[in-house]
């Protein structure tokens, strides 16, 4: 499966790092294309960065009465970790993200340790899982309002073939009043990945924030990116 993407190349000179960020259900890459401008306005990061915002394919989504919408995998029941899950679609999207990582490394000569993957909601779920399954070490992972709908499958795959990113920095952020992906579901997801052995995962709580990214959370994300890009 190949997908299109919004690409915002580094300004002025060759990129030294890359951020690949996956949107949530029903959104598009364009929905997060403002992120580079926010990073620039912060004046915290000087190194040039390639930004890639992939577009999920339009697929029939069960909670949308079967009508097609942009989605990284089908959802049968919103926010329920025990519901039926689209395991096949989920792992297909993980493979797509792997392809974008390799593209940045092979085509643009970005060091793997300077590549950060991430996403919001569905995109966060894919990013966390992909990090667990990679056989190459990368720079970091950002998971905003994320979850893990394939808990058993991730555990089984990881135990059979542990990845190499067990000490890779992971930023997970979640609002306490998220009505879509419950805060506790996000917290359980962080505990799952910690149990798998990801010792450099930090779960960040944002009081009063719903299913969105607050200014405080985004400021923390920029600092996280800076620490990886400029180390």
Swiss-Prot record:
Top-level division of the source organism's lineage: Eukaryota
GO process terms (BP): fatty acid metabolic process
Residues the record marks as active site: 121 (charge relay system), 178 (charge relay system), 211 (charge relay system)
An annotated GO cellular component: nucleus
Location (main, coarse): cytoplasm
EC number: 3.1.2.-, 3.1.2.22
Residues forming coiled coils: none
Record InterPro entries: AB_hydrolase_fold (IPR029058), LYPA1-2/EST-like (IPR050565), PLipase/COase/thioEstase (IPR003140)
Keyword Amino-acid biosynthesis: no
Record keywords: Cytoplasm, Fatty acid metabolism, Hydrolase, Lipid metabolism, Nucleus, Serine esterase
GO molecular function terms attached to this record: carboxylic ester hydrolase activity; palmitoyl-(protein) hydrolase activity
Keyword Lipid metabolism: yes
Protein task: Hydrolyzes fatty acids from S-acylated cysteine residues in proteins with a strong preference for palmitoylated G-alpha proteins over other acyl substrates. Mediates the deacylation of G-alpha proteins such as GPA1 in vivo, but has weak or no activity toward palmitoylated Ras proteins. Has weak lysophospholipase activity in vitro; however such activity may not exist in vivo.
Protein name: Acyl-protein thioesterase 1
């Amino acid at each position: 499966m190949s997908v299109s993407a919004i690409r915002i190349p580094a300004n002025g000179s060759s990129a030294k790092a890359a951020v690949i960020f996956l949107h949530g259900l029903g959104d598009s890459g364009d929905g997060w294309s403002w992120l580079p401008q926010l990073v620039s306005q912060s004046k915290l990061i000087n190194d040039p960065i390639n930004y890639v915002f992939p577009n999920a394919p339009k697929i029939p989504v069960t909670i949308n009465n079967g009508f097609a919408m942009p989605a990284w995998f089908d959802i049968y029941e919103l926010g329920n970790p025990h519901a039926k899950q689209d395991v096949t679609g989920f792992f297909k999207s993980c493979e797509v993200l792997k392809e974008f990582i390799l593209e940045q490394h092979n085509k643009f000569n970005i060091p793997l340790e300077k590549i950060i993957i991430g996403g919001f909601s569905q995109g966060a779920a894919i990013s966390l899982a992909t990090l667990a399954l990679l056989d190459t070490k990368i720079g970091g992972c950002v998971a905003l309002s994320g979850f893990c709908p394939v808990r058993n499958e991730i555990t089984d795959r990881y135990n059979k073939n542990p990845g190499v990113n067990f000490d890779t920095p992971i930023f997970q952020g979640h609002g306490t009043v998220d009505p879509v992906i419950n805060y506790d579901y996000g917290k359980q997801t962080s505990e799952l990945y910690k149990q798998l052995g990801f010792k450099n995962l930090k779960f960040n709580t944002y009081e009063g924030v719903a299913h969105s990214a607050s200014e405080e959370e985004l400021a923390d994300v920029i600092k996280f990116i800076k620490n990886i890009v400029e180390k």
